[in-house]
Amino acid sequence: MGDGWRPGVADLVKNTPKVLNLKDSMKVLFLASWYPMNGRSGNGIFAIRQAEALAQAYQRFGRSVTVDVMAVQPRAWMGGRVQILGEVPGGPDQSTPRGDLRHWLLTYQDGRGGLFSLINQCWAWLRLLRAYHRHHGDRATVVVAQVAWKAAVVALLLGRPYGVMEHWSGYLEKEPPLKPITKWLVRRSLRNARSVAAVSPWLADALMQFCSGLRVSTLPNVIEEVHWTPPAVDLAAGQGAAGDVTSGSEPWRDPRVFLHVSDLAPVKNPALLFGAWALSGLSDQGYLLRVAGEYSQESKARYASVKGLEWLGILSPTELCYQLRSSRALLLSSHRETFSILAGEALLNGCSVWTSYPPLRSFYQGLDGLVSLPDDQPLTWSLALQEAAASNPHPWNSPQAVRLVQERLKPYRNHEAGQAMLSWIDAWKP
């Protein structure tokens, strides 16, 4: 295994705090295929939010249950070596109660070939599981695998009762991009699960097509509480200043500002986004496209020649809320979305959402603020941008309209989503 930085298993177990009074309580272990590299933001935050919501639900009912989240991630993804052993992390942005969720995370050396990578990952999982056992005095009662590959495969090997919670958009492709052996492992882990759920009806349908005979229910994602305070009625131009989250005041919604938030991966369709923006010519009229998210410097450089862009980088939940309340519309250019927490966050903050993805158009149908585009062609989007610039529509986000959004999205609030997760686990736990 060769990495000199790694402490031995004995040292790891010795240095992990042991809690002697937890052995008789129910223990729920979330295995996360992805773990956010930036705290409260980034790919994988959905797993943390669901685990927190579940932990808080157990607390509300006074049930003696511990909830932990565990992940093994490549160092390249996490930006270096990371070791979290049974910590309850806090942070400057306390917009969501944590529910005393305990985290376990190790990174492994990737990029050394398939066999070396597999050995490194197995070793990291073994270390974490032994440390978890030392802390709790026993194995997990039930396991929740967040995304089948690779968490459900690990859950299958553990031999504990487990359910699978799926978020991956790969199943929405005509042929999921998985190698044959990976497909076999994923299908076996799904079929051996006590229950399988997905975050949207269209993802559930795709999973059942991928794995014949599988029954898949739907469980909601979690939209953080910071987004549930209704925005103030839009101010007239000049009465505020967008982009200054430090002031604490309600931002002015700038009709000349559009927003996009993603890592600019191919599934997010950046070619459509930037192609339509450049074709529209709005930058020459003083319009601005703000781009936020976990994009790489290579992605940023690729579109450096496009005029009228402002790069924001990674945003905290509070910063995202501010930007959504500062922008005219969120441009959601994705080829596919399993649910899009971001679309819900935008509408809750009174920000219009533009999308051409049919399931999202259907899901949000009837809500003011949804701009449904007929296709994902740059010309279609550029013409829509030009038309928006030429018009001066009355703000859609009246208190009544935002209340309708809140009613539609109520199952995705922390309290309700946590209760749904608790009921799901109660239905299949031993």
Sequence positions of predicted segments:
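An aromatic- and histidine-rich active-site surface loop
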Residues: S117-L128, V142-R160
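Short hydrophobic beta-strand element within catalytic cores of glycosyltransferases
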Residues: S352-S356
